[in-house]
């Protein structure tokens, strides 16, 4: 397993996450770990004019106390797709190349995804293509405990300096 790493699913993960995607030819994306709120699984942090801004994708509550990541459903509560897209536009519309990427990026906020894992994986694959990276992203077939692998899960943003959306 020296040529691959296991990463957790993440919504527009921090740059450290992508350095692992760059460093390994094969990356397993853990989809059988237990979902935890307030992690990068459904939260990203962007640089806004007023400082770091946390954007959170709402999820549906599961009847099961320990829902696996692949089964977490996205909720349409709060019109989050519209709110997130407007936050990206407000933060980056004057950035170089925003117009070049905006149409393709916007499709992630127009399309309804049922599962958070699917949304995160497709978005990660798109980001990788934009920066000329082609890692092999492979969803895990069963839970892989951290002790069995060189596992790196960037799971939780720091609550400091964050505003909620």
Which ranges hold each PLM region?
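A structural signal for well-ordered alpha-helical segments within the folded catalytic domains
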Residues: 15, 82, 86, 118-125
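A basic- and aromatic-enriched beta-loop-alpha substructure that forms the phosphate/nucleotide-
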Residues: 39-110
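Short secondary-structure capping/junction motifs at helix and strand boundaries
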Residues: 95-100, 133-138, 164
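Single conserved hydrophobic/aromatic residue that forms the stacking wall/gate
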Residues: 154-165
């Amino acid at each position: 397993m020296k040529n691959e790493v296991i990463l957790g699913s993440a919504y527009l993960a921090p740059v450290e996450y992508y350095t692992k995607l760059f460093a390994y030819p094969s990356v397993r994306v853990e989809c059988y770990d237990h979902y935890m709120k307030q992690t990068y699984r459904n939260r990203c942090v962007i640089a806004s004019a007023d400082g770091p801004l946390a954007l959170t994708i709402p999820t549906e509550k599961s009847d099961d106390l320990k829902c696996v990541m692949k089964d977490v459903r996205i909720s349409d509560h709060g019109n989050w797709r519209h709110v997130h897209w407007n936050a990206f536009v407000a933060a980056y519309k004057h950035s170089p190349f925003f117009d070049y990427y905006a149409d393709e990026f916007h499709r992630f906020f127009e399309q309804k995804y049922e599962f958070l894992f699917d949304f995160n994986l497709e978005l990660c694959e798109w980001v990788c293509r934009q920066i000329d990276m082609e890692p092999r992203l492979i969803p895990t077939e069963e839970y892989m405990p951290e002790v069995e692998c060189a596992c790196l899960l960037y799971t939780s943003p720091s609550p400091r300096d964050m505003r909620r959306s």
